[in-house]
Amino acid sequence: MSSLEVGVLDFGASSLAGSVAVDRALIEAPFRPDLLSLVINWQLAKRRAGTHKTKGISEVSGTTRKPYRQKGTGRARQGSLRAPQFRKGGIVFGPVVRQHGFSVNKKVRSLALRSALSMRFAEGRLFVLESSRLGESKAATLLKWFASNAELSVGKKFLIVTEEKNEGLLRAASNLHWVKVLWGSSANVYDVVLHDFVLLEKASVDVLVKRLLK
């Protein structure tokens, strides 16, 4: 298994604390904008409730009587006051309750996530994060660290990926709208692309390797 060196950020320090070897297949996948677009659309489609609904001509309330006789009035023929051209008439081809989701193969989703991580690594915006004090952090501590670290840019969005759900870090980051915390099993293409920097907890790298490469 070949690997690449990824910079390590120590939580609390203001510069790189060294580097760590990460599986090359995880962070050097080919750039596939077509798959990134497909998987992002797939994620967003699944979130849609699909509960929007309009009434058609057969569903709106009103009389079924023909408004006036077919011939002899000089007006255009009409068969129902519930037709779409009338006020309070039914809607033609309006939205109906449905599922917007569609299926994407697991291998495609895996390649898209590796492509997104590789994109951030190629940009120099993917780091491994030392995790010894992550669970003890406060919002003020996070804010101070992001502002003082030379490798990170102020005013950008940050995605922190931990090994498993970290309640302490989630509470701290909830007060910072530009920081999002996920865990290895929930890391996804949309959030990697949405955020400018990706910080992987050391233990989360193994979770991602097992999830995406096995």
Curated annotation (Swiss-Prot):
Q: An example of a Gene Ontology BP annotation on this entry?
A: translation
What molecular function terms (GO) are annotated for this protein?
Answer: rRNA binding; structural constituent of ribosome
Q: Name one Pfam family in it.
A: Ribosomal_L4
Annotated region (Disordered) at 53-79
Q: Give the CC-aspect GO terms.
A: ribonucleoprotein complex; ribosome
Per UniProt, which keywords does this protein have? Ribonucleoprotein, Ribosomal protein, RNA-binding, rRNA-binding
The record ties this protein, via InterPro entries, to: Ribosomal_uL4 (IPR002136), Ribosomal_uL4-like (IPR013005), Ribosomal_uL4_dom_sf (IPR023574)
Report TM segments: none
Hey, what's the signal peptide range on this chain?
Answer: none
Q: What does this protein do?
A: One of the primary rRNA binding proteins, this protein initially binds near the 5'-end of the 23S rRNA. It is important during the early stages of 50S assembly. It makes multiple contacts with different domains of the 23S rRNA in the assembled 50S subunit and ribosome.
Q: Which family does it belong to?
A: Belongs to the universal ribosomal protein uL4 family.
What PANTHER family does its record include?
50S RIBOSOMAL PROTEIN L4, LARGE RIBOSOMAL SUBUNIT PROTEIN UL4M
Subunit field text: Part of the 50S ribosomal subunit.
Q: What protein am I looking at?
A: Large ribosomal subunit protein uL4
Q: What is the originating organism of this protein?
A: Neorickettsia sennetsu (strain ATCC VR-367 / Miyayama) (Ehrlichia sennetsu)
Q: Which gene holds the coding sequence for this protein?
A: rplD
